[in-house]
């Protein structure tokens, strides 16, 4: 066999092989590659939209956190105001109670003082009466004694 004929036969066989591959093998491979390219493109678009959605979600979360922090600060400030108001009310109530207790104590002291004064006055009167009786028993001049008794009673 001649080398030229062999090369020519191999070239024909190769051409037939390439034609068969182009007709039966190449189209499914191309369609698989195109499908894969389309899937990759779709995945890239999905990733980009997901990134955008994630950025929007992050921004919304940040705004939401800022709003929550502001609300928390407002709540804390309101609680502090309420605390101060309660403290002021408690102080005022304590002052009112203290004043009532002091007034009651002063009334009680005044009442006890009057009672003690009255008891002392009664004791003095009894002593005067006893001393008067003794003077009268021992005394001869009743006019003088009555003047003394009248003076003592007038002083009481």
Curated annotation (Swiss-Prot):
Give the subcellular location: Cell membrane
Domain of life where this protein originates: Bacteria
Q: Name one Pfam family in it.
A: ATP-synt_B
Q: How does it sit in the membrane?
A: Single-pass membrane protein
- Leader sequence range is none
Q: Name one GO cellular component term.
A: proton-transporting ATP synthase complex
Which sequence ranges are marked TM in the entry? 7-26
Q: Which keywords does this chain's UniProt record carry? A: ATP synthesis, Cell membrane, CF(0), Hydrogen ion transport, Ion transport, Membrane, Transmembrane, Transmembrane helix, Transport
InterPro entries this protein is in? ATP_synth_B-like_membr_sf (IPR028987), ATP_synth_b/b'su_bac/chlpt (IPR002146), ATP_synth_F0_bsu_bac (IPR005864), ATP_synthase_B_chain (IPR050059)
- Primary subcellular site in the record, as a coarse category: membrane
Query: Which family does the UniProt entry place this protein in?
Result: Belongs to the ATPase B chain family.
Identify the HAMAP family for this entry.
Answer: ATP_synth_b_bprime
What this chain does, per the entry, is described as:
F(1)F(0) ATP synthase produces ATP from ADP in the presence of a proton or sodium gradient. F-type ATPases consist of two structural domains, F(1) containing the extramembraneous catalytic core and F(0) containing the membrane proton channel, linked together by a central stalk and a peripheral stalk. During catalysis, ATP synthesis in the catalytic domain of F(1) is coupled via a rotary mechanism of the central stalk subunits to proton translocation.
- What is the protein's quaternary organization? F-type ATPases have 2 components, F(1) - the catalytic core - and F(0) - the membrane proton channel. F(1) has five subunits: alpha(3), beta(3), gamma(1), delta(1), epsilon(1). F(0) has three main subunits: a(1), b(2) and c(10-14). The alpha and beta chains form an alternating ring which encloses part of the gamma chain. F(1) is attached to F(0) by a central stalk formed by the gamma and epsilon chains, while a peripheral stalk is formed by the delta and b chains.
Question: This chain belongs to which protein, by name?
Answer: ATP synthase subunit b
Q: Which gene encodes it?
A: atpF
